[in-house]
Amino acid sequence: MAVPFRRTSKTRKRLRRTHFKLQVPGMVECPNCGEMKLAHRVCKSCGTYKGREVVNK
């Protein structure tokens, strides 16, 4: 079985891992109630989406 010829340096290892990171969710302000919510999703506090009430609270 093949083995690495040289040890992978810290810099090369870290450069390879720069893409393995968590993404921050896109938060926007709800136009109806003003609370922060995830973009393109129903507001948890008032239950509206695109100006319409989707969930009865």
From Swiss-Prot:
GO terms under biological process: translation
Pfam families: Ribosomal_L32p
Keywords: Ribonucleoprotein, Ribosomal protein
Domain of life: Bacteria
UniProt KW Cell membrane keyword: no
GO molecular function: structural constituent of ribosome
GO cellular component term, pick one: large ribosomal subunit
Stated family: Belongs to the bacterial ribosomal protein bL32 family.
Record-linked NCBIfam families: rpmF_bact (TIGR01031)
Protein name: Large ribosomal subunit protein bL32
Organism: Geobacillus sp. (strain WCH70)
Lineage: Bacteria, Bacillati, Bacillota, Bacilli, Bacillales
